[in-house]
Amino acid sequence: MKLSTKLCWCGIKGRLRPQKQQQLHNTNLQMTELKKQKTAEQKTRPQNVGIKGIQIYIPTQCVNQSELEKFDGVSQGKYTIGLGQTNMSFVNDREDIYSMSLTVLSKLIKSYNIDTNKIGRLEVGTETLIDKSKSVKSVLMQLFGENTDVEGIDTLNACYGGTNALFNSLNWIESNAWDGRDAIVVCGDIAIYDKGAARPTGGAGTVAMWIGPDAPIVFDSVRASYMEHAYDFYKPDFTSEYPYVDGHFSLTCYVKALDQVYKSYSKKAISKGLVSDPAGSDALNVLKYFDYNVFHVPTCKLVTKSYGRLLYNDFRANPQLFPEVDAELATRDYDESLTDKNIEKTFVNVAKPFHKERVAQSLIVPTNTGNMYTASVYAAFASLLNYVGSDDLQGKRVGLFSYGSGLAASLYSCKIVGDVQHIIKELDITNKLAKRITETPKDYEAAIELRENAHLKKNFKPQGSIEHLQSGVYYLTNIDDKFRRSYDVKK
């Protein structure tokens, strides 16, 4: 009989053969080394991941909404009171999403003295498409010198793309693929509409965020999303910059998405033991959990209504929270409640004193710029920082609601854990708003017409003025016969 060479035991004492003893010893050493490596990795995992810096680009031209009301022949207050808008930013054919993204990113890099070699991810959120193949991110790589090892591309879903780019960046830093470098998120759009009721809800602007560990603004581990197929707002016509919009349906989609992400976020936060006194199993009690709330801002009036809607969610879970309100409203059919004007009006009034202290500061930029689409919620967040101030924000939690038609929505939150005065200084929002040129409605219409004429053109030189542009702003100079775009920087 042949003895197997694989036998590892011999003798009555069951001793291991020397070869097997050595193999076992080596295995133990390897396991010990792996444990050491794992312990070391745990010690070096990034902590306090969040926003280290923010920059915002607000175009230097705007139109006053009161003047636009007169120009459009609508009733006084339709745009200013009905929509809650004061001014609307716009650009002519000299600026596009490439130039506006280059402008805000270059300003972020310069204002925070960022070493671009230490950036390992750059992602862009936008719905303002110039090319169906080439990404905005690839254009921005011109600012990174010899650093070509940079992950990330563009992400698209209406106004939600900036948030998805942010989540991707946070996930990358917290993953095993992280190489120790920081990330940058760029988001923004040019929001314009065809003539009609939606035109005053436009706007323009870009935001860039520097993301990394040891940040003064740290994102919480809880977030919730709601995704659904809906034709509330979409852009199927590539021959035009204008969207197709089902206005009333889109408002309902926004409110429904807010309800759903609030319920999901509440359940997750409660299950993690983060909520001390919830309103119910799926309502965490907004007024006790969040110190401030920031929203995607199609219009400021919608945000005012939406904050009241959050309180209504708590009321449905526990009517005793607001004993002054008729308890019968808590039992209304849910679908009917989405468009119930009595509920809406009641909770706008209930929320009014809290809105003044916790939301209004975030709306100063949006009411003066209009909708920046993907940058909207982050422009509102920048507004909150600027008009509340670093001292009053210390230790405070901010809830953020991001919405993109089609639809995609998320509720997430961050906490201010360090001094943000330097961020407020670099944002320089008050001066940026003050230095703008307020154009006439005719000037606004002329700028939109220039954009219409420039759309999809090649062998084209833009006709718009650059006199209003400030130093450091990128602008379009030429589109050649192969649609390749050239830019310059205003001196």
From Swiss-Prot:
Matches recorded under PROSITE patterns: HMG_COA_SYNTHASE
Alphabetical list of Pfam families matching this protein: HMG_CoA_synt_C, HMG_CoA_synt_N
Anything else known: Present with 34800 molecules/cell in log phase SD medium.
MF annotations from Gene Ontology: hydroxymethylglutaryl-CoA synthase activity
Name by which UniProt lists this protein: Hydroxymethylglutaryl-CoA synthase
Keywords (A to Z) from UniProt: Lipid biosynthesis, Lipid metabolism, Phosphoprotein, Steroid biosynthesis, Steroid metabolism, Sterol biosynthesis, Sterol metabolism, Transferase
Binding-site residues for (3S)-3-hydroxy-3-methylglutaryl-CoA, renumbered to this chain: C159, T201, S250, H296, K305, N371, S405
SUPFAM superfamilies assigned: Thiolase-like
Knocked-out gene: effects: Drastically increases HMG2 half-life.
Modified sites of kind Phosphoserine: S276
PANTHER family, sorted: 3-HYDROXY-3-METHYLGLUTARYL COENZYME A SYNTHASE (PTHR43323), HYDROXYMETHYLGLUTARYL-COA SYNTHASE (PTHR43323:SF2)
Gene designation per UniProt: ERG13
Active site: E127, C159, H296
Organism: Saccharomyces cerevisiae (strain ATCC 204508 / S288c) (Baker's yeast)
Gene3D superfamilies linked to this entry: 3.40.47.10
E.C. code: 2.3.3.10
GO cellular component: mitochondrion; nucleus
Annotated function: Hydroxymethylglutaryl-CoA synthase; part of the first module of ergosterol biosynthesis pathway that includes the early steps of the pathway, conserved across all eukaryotes, and which results in the formation of mevalonate from acetyl-coenzyme A (acetyl-CoA). ERG13 condenses acetyl-CoA with acetoacetyl-CoA to form hydroxymethylglutaryl-CoA (HMG-CoA). The first module starts with the action of the cytosolic acetyl-CoA acetyltransferase ERG10 that catalyzes the formation of acetoacetyl-CoA.
Similarity comment: family membership: Belongs to the thiolase-like superfamily. HMG-CoA synthase family.
UniProt record, GO biological process: acetyl-CoA metabolic process; ergosterol biosynthetic process; farnesyl diphosphate biosynthetic process, mevalonate pathway
Cystine pairings recorded for this chain: none
Organism domain of life: Eukaryota
Pathway field: Metabolic intermediate biosynthesis; (R)-mevalonate biosynthesis; (R)-mevalonate from acetyl-CoA: step 2/3
Catalytic activity: acetoacetyl-CoA + acetyl-CoA + H2O = (3S)-3-hydroxy-3-methylglutaryl-CoA + CoA + H(+)
